[in-house]
Amino acid sequence: MPRRRRASRRVRRRRRPRVSRRRRRGGRRRR
């Protein structure tokens, strides 16, 4: 029987360092 995750109202927020939107991995955007 697969485990079910209980939906909790309280969501734990992960602290993440602020990253500027312009510079992401690699800096330049490729398409």
Swiss-Prot record:
Localization, UniProt: Nucleus; Chromosome
Kindly list the GO CC terms recorded for this protein: nucleosome; nucleus
Organ and tissue specificity: Testis.
**Which UniProt keywords are listed?**
Chromosome, Developmental protein, Differentiation, DNA condensation, DNA-binding, Nucleosome core, Nucleus, Spermatogenesis
| Major localization listed first in the record, in broad terms | nucleus
GO function term, MF aspect, one: DNA binding
**Annotated region (Disordered), positions in chain:** 1-31
Nucleus as UniProt keyword: yes
Q: Name one GO biological process term.
A: cell differentiation
State the superkingdom: Eukaryota
Q: What this chain does, per the record?
A: Protamines substitute for histones in the chromatin of sperm during the haploid phase of spermatogenesis. They compact sperm DNA into a highly condensed, stable and inactive complex.
Q: What is this protein called?
A: Protamine-1A
